[in-house]
């Protein structure tokens, strides 16, 4: 498992948010496994705990909203960053 400074992790989460926003926008949702796979690739994580922590951070930062165990809604990224 790779460790990243907070600033670098924030940028990686923003990149994931922008990627999915450009794919589906606000009209459709993505699946939780799809988001977890993107986090796994971007952060180079293998363990589920670290992936789950990043999903929770994305919820805390209001980047995503989880409707159920599988539906994940992407919130619109800030344009000023």
Region annotations inferred by a language model:
Residues 40, 56, 60:
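Residue-level detection of the helix-turn-helix DNA-binding "recognition helix"
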Residues 45-57:
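Short amphipathic alpha-helical interaction segments
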Residues 1-22:
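Short alpha-helical segments that sit at the start of domains
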Residues 69-81:
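Short, cationic-aromatic polyanion-contact patches
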Residues 26-39:
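Short acidic, hydrophobic short linear motifs in intrinsically disordered regions
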Residues 22-23, 42:
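Alpha-helix C-capping/helix-to-loop hinge sites
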Residues 59-69:
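A short, conserved structural fragment
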Residues 2-5, 26-29, 64:
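N-terminal regulatory modules in eukaryotic regulatory proteins
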């Amino acid at each position: 498992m790779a460790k990243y400074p907070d600033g670098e992790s924030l940028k990686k989460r923003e990149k994931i948010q922008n990627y999915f926003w450009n794919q589906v926008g606000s009209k459709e949702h993505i699946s939780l496994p799809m988001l977890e796979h993107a986090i796994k690739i971007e952060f180079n994580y293998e363990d589920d705990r670290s992936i789950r922590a990043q999903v929770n951070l994305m919820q805390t930062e209001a980047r995503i909203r989880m409707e159920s165990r599988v539906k994940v809604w992407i919130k619109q990224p800030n344009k000023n960053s």
